């Protein structure tokens, strides 16, 4: 029986989940929910189903894998990764995965703040990258070395 991934009909938070499902060659179906046009942004397609799925915390994205029902994008990613032994075997490897997961979240949040800003534009991005708030690393620096990796 295929897993079921539910999310809005956009890339958003579910896109990393889709990529991991594809990478792991996981059999899954997708349920996409539409949002109506402005100014109402009708969400009734999702709201009509939201409380019928048996989710502990009804939200999007969600993943249903048999009796396992998950929400929250990072919890879903970790669940899939654990199923496919992608979370490391040693404590050191698991720590690295934890750190990288949180670093990716920080980068994603910083980019979202820029992209969803009402003042979004190249001047704004350029100013941010020249400011003291912009941190190029540690992932993008030569110092970001994991032992002998």
What residues fall within each predicted segment?
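C-terminal helix/juxtamembrane-tail motif
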Residues: 1-4, 131-149
């Amino acid at each position: 029986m295929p897993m079921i991934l539910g999310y809005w009909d956009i890339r958003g938070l579910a896109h990393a989940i889709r990529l991991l499902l594809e990478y792991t060659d996981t059999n899954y179906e997708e349920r996409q929910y539409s949002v109506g046009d402005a100014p109402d942004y009708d969400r009734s397609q999702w709201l009509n189903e939201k409380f019928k799925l048996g989710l502990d915390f009804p939200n999007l994205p969600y993943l249903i894998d048999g009796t396992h029902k998950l929400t929250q994008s990072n919890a879903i990613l970790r669940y899939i990764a654990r199923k496919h032994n992608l979370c490391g075997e040693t404590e050191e490897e698991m720590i690295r995965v934890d750190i990288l997961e949180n670093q990716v979240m920080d980068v994603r949040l910083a980019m979202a703040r820029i992209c969803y800003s009402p003042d979004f534009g190249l001047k704004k991005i350029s100013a941010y990258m020249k400011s003291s708030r912009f941190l190029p690393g540690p992932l993008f620096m030569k110092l970001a070395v994991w032992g002998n990796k």
